[in-house]
């Protein structure tokens, strides 16, 4: 299986945390959570390779430093036929589809999983179980802890990725035929967008890079892994 992880430009990342963290602090946290997410993915034997999709050179440098392939996100150069700028979810889904097509053009028919880049409490065992469940075939999703978003999207066999990320993505993926995967995977289901999400991952236990970032922010979590 090939994992795809998308990361937007650091200057616009985690805007919902802007009330508590300045731009530099948010960028530091994003990079730390990405580092821990990639480390967890690397610990899962069922995942052979990883691609980070990003337009950001700092994110790309981190990915290269841990031996991950980078696909240059074409989203910043995408425009609609009427000249308007596409919505964020449109550019994200276009970038993911382009990356998936590139991967399969080079590697043939491979199973794919798109993972959120901000899963600092995810455990290798959780992802291993989700991969095993997804391999029964077709498209499937791990719904996030809010019940509305998507933490992971799988496309196995010859199934197209067909990403529907954006508001209410869990519903969008379900309506397009993706089946929900059932499992007690709190770390896998908890991506970080808000201060409440940060509290949740603190309680679950975060990876070392995220712990260090939170410590720098003087918000040391009570638990770590």
Swiss-Prot record:
The keyword DNA-binding does not apply. It catalyses: phosphoenolpyruvate + GTP + H(+) = enolpyruvoyl-2-diphospho-5'-guanosine + diphosphate. Residues 167-186 are annotated as: Disordered. Pathway: Cofactor biosynthesis; coenzyme F420 biosynthesis. Pfam families: CofC. Phosphoenolpyruvate binds at residues 150, 166, 169. Gene3D superfamilies: Spore Coat Polysaccharide Biosynthesis Protein SpsA, Chain A. Its EC number is 2.7.7.105. Keywords: GTP-binding, Nucleotide-binding, Nucleotidyltransferase, Transferase. GO terms for molecular function: GTP binding; phospholactate guanylyltransferase activity. It is an enzyme of class 2 (transferase). One of its GO terms (biological process) is F420-0 metabolic process. Guanylyltransferase that catalyzes the activation of phosphoenolpyruvate (PEP) as enolpyruvoyl-2-diphospho-5'-guanosine, via the condensation of PEP with GTP. It is involved in the biosynthesis of coenzyme F420, a hydride carrier cofactor. NCBIfam families: F420_cofC. Belongs to the CofC family. This is Phosphoenolpyruvate guanylyltransferase. It comes from Rhodococcus erythropolis (strain PR4 / NBRC 100887).
